[in-house]
């Protein structure tokens, strides 16, 4: 006959197990009722109220983004260029100038296929180098540009040519301070000739080369040339490739004609000082040399 203690032990274990089952079942039932009342069962479709809240949050976010964009489309210095394009930190200005001069200089060694052949002239070199300097320089960018390019600086942080309110129409084409209507009435364009660059997109700096910095533009005015009276060069200063260590390099496109596509030249100012035609000498006594100008986005 079994010991009485052995018979009571199983009875206690079954009672304890039954108690656990009852408690668990009650808790599960209570949770199910509560979740049905709140409608917040994980994985279930959102209720109409939840959808409405989500739409409201998205609308508020969109409205906030619009306010930021509108706030950026102001011209606090009344120079005609919206603040969103202007590079306000030293780091961004330095990065832009390094990319700008490097891209312009590289065209002397090998023209990039990304530079439209129909826009290869002196102002076209400035436009091309400006746009490409303002892009993000990732692996795809290097592949598109071709050989001979390397990282010369970080990217411009405050402005991205591919994601901004103006798109690639970053060159102003008329006098006046900026207004939002300028974006719709043609006062900004992807194109800018030498005259447009001088009058609306740059500021005069100096006629003294000692005060010029890399990235400045040399501008000449040749009134006897009917179609394009203004000629532009890019001041490199100490070029990336400088066999003699000179620090007064410039690069420019000679311009095209019906019989000549023109070419990109890289030369020292000290050499241009002795140009056979004195009207092309970058000296203060030459009235055709207007001086050094700086892009407004760097001001």
What role is predicted for each listed range?
Residues 245-299:
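Low-complexity, Gly/Ser/Thr/Pro-rich intrinsically disordered linker/tail segments
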Residues 43, 61, 66-188:
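N-terminal capping segments
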Residues 6-21:
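N-terminal Sec-pathway targeting helices
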Residues 31, 39-41, 67, 72, ...:
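Low-complexity, Ser/Thr/Pro/Gly-rich disordered linker/stalk regions
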Residues 36-68:
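Short, basic, low-complexity termini and linkers enriched in Ser/Thr/Gly/Pro
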Residues 151-259:
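...with weaker cross-activation on analogous glycine-rich loops/strands in unrelated enzymes
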């Amino acid at each position: 006959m079994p010991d009485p203690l052995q018979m009571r032990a199983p009875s206690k274990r079954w009672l304890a197990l039954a108690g656990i089952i009852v408690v668990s079942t009650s808790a599960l039932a209570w949770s199910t009722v509560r979740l049905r009342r709140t409608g917040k069962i994980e994985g279930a479709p959102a209720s109409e109220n939840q959808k409405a809240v989500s739409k409201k949050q998205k609308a508020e976010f969109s409205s906030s983004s619009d306010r930021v964009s509108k706030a950026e489309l102001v011209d606090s210095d009344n120079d005609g260029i919206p603040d969103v394009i202007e590079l306000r930190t030293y780091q961004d200005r330095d990065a832009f100038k390094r990319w700008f001069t490097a891209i312009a200089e590289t065209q002397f060694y090998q023209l990039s296929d990304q530079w439209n052949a129909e826009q290869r002239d002196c102002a076209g070199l400035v436009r091309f180098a400006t746009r490409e300097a303002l892009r993000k320089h990732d692996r795809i960018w290097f592949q598109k540009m071709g050989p001979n390019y390397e990282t010369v600086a970080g990217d411009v942080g405050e402005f991205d040519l591919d994601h901004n309110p103006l798109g690639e129409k970053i060159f102003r084409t008329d006098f006046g301070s900026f207004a939002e209507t300028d974006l719709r009435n043609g006062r900004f364009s992807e194109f800018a000739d030498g005259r447009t660059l001088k009058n609306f997109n740059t500021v005069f700096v100096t006629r003294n080369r000692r005060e010029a910095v890399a990235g400045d533009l040399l501008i000449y005015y040749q009134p006897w040339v009917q179609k394009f009276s203004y000629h532009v060069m890019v001041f490199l200063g100490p070029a990336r490739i400088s066999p003699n260590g000179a620090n007064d390099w410039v690069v420019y496109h000679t311009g095209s004609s019906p019989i000549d596509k023109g070419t990109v030249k890289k030369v020292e100012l000290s050499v241009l000082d002795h140009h056979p035609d004195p009207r092309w000498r970058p000296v203060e006594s030459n009235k055709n040399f207007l001086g050094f100008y700086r892009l407004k986005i760097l001001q």
